[in-house]
From Swiss-Prot:
InterPro entries: PSRP-3/Ycf65_sf (IPR038447), Ribosomal_PSRP3/Ycf65 (IPR006924). GO terms for cellular component: chloroplast; ribonucleoprotein complex; ribosome. HAMAP family: Ribosomal_plastid_cS23. GO terms for biological process: translation. This is Small ribosomal subunit protein cS23. The gene is ycf65. Keywords: Chloroplast, Plastid, Ribonucleoprotein, Ribosomal protein. The keyword Ribonucleoprotein applies.
Length: 101
């Protein structure tokens, strides 16, 4: 069972990520949205994960790798490619894309 959920806003000019924790059937937000490229969303997420002793290093690495993959995917696409939401959800099934423009 997945313990954490990454949520993404997939926008034309930026991508944003937040982290939620799953507890049973409930989901509780742990972070605000960190926007990239306005700030270093990856670094902000890393700082958050490192500050929580109850999140182990293997979970942190997995989450940060997923953030890296999605930010890289966003960077590699032009504006028209960023609109292909179905491809995105297929490529990254373990994260939630909750907003698009």
């Amino acid at each position: 069972m997945q313990k954490f959920v990454l949520k993404f806003l997939w926008l034309q000019r930026s991508v944003a990520v937040s982290l939620d924790q799953k507890i049973g059937d409930n989901v509780s937000p742990l972070t605000e949205f960190y926007f990239w490229p306005q700030c270093d969303a990856w670094e902000e997420m890393r700082n958050f994960l490192e500050s929580k002793s109850w999140i182990n290093s293997s979970e942190s690495i997995l989450l940060l790798n997923q953030v890296t993959e999605i930010i890289n995917d966003w960077q590699e696409k032009d504006d028209s490619q960023r609109k292909d939401i179905f491809d995105l959800k297929e490529k990254f099934p373990f994260v939630d894309f909750i907003g698009f423009d």
